[in-house]
């Protein structure tokens, strides 16, 4: 069976390139981030990498204190609601929202005035610069709030039915921590034996798919938002798709 890998393209979406070996190959994007002087200001740390495991990078100072405060403020202005999972396709083209007992956080989406806010725009441009993937491939920022004892049990960001959508599936998650948490609230990757501690300005980047088969979920990056024990945790999440997400989404596709 022919295998494929994802090749980073600064000018557009990822390209699928045939390779002769079905072995997992590293994303060129991750190699570029780690090796390029351009990104050293974000202090990229390799937490996991092939061949031992999937790529997992951690950054520091990806967003400033001012930017973090503004995103928290924008989330408060929009209003946080109970987080839900994406459900079944409805006759009107939308998807139902399913409450999940394993997910007790609250969130909102950076749309309308938030989407055009200069700081939100700047943050999304920075993610585009780091990943080399157009902002159009990303869902709107999801702004999250975890209060005491709130959590999100082990899960993957990969959504199978999106394979049949023009957007393709989520291939990458870029998660940013907007504040320090007094206790708890880490992001755990159980299959990698890794837990990332929340810290303002810190970010984590990982793939949801296999490099040699970007249509298939990589279960090794299943992760869990551990319960907040003391304080409140704020975060911002960018889910990046194989192809343009925003245009088909606006068209109801």
What are these regions (language model features)?
Residues 1-205, 209-253:
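Fe(II)/2-oxoglutarate oxygenase catalytic core
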């Amino acid at each position: 069976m022919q295998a494929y890998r994802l090749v980073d393209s600064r000018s557009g979406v990822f390209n699928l390139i045939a390779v002769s070996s079905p072995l997992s190959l590293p994303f060129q994007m991750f190699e570029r981030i780690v090796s390029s002087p351009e990104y050293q200001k974000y202090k990229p740390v390799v937490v996991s990498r092939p061949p031992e495991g999937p790529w997992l990078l951690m950054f520091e100072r990806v967003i400033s204190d001012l930017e973090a405060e503004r995103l928290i403020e924008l989330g408060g202005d929009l209003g946080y609601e109970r987080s839900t999972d994406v459900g079944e396709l409805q006759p009107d083209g939308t998807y139902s929202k399913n409450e999940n007992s394993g997910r007790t956080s609250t969130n909102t989406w950076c749309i309308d005035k938030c989407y055009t806010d200069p700081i939100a725009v700047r943050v999304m441009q920075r993610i585009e610069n780091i990943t080399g993937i157009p902002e159009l491939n990303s869902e709107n920022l999801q702004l999250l709030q975890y209060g005491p004892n709130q959590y999100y049990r082990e899960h993957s960001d990969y959504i199978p039915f999106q394979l049949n959508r023009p957007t393709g599936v989520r291939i990458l998650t870029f998660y940013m921590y907007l504040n320090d948490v007094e206790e708890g609230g880490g992001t755990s990757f159980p299959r990698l034996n890794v837990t990332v501690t929340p810290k303002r300005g810190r970010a984590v980047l990982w793939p949801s798919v296999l490099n040699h088969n970007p249509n298939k979920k990589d279960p090794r990056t299943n992760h869990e938002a551990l319960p907040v024990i003391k304080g409140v945790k704020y975060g911002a999440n960018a889910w990046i798709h194989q192809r343009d997400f925003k245009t088909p989404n606006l068209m109801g596709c």
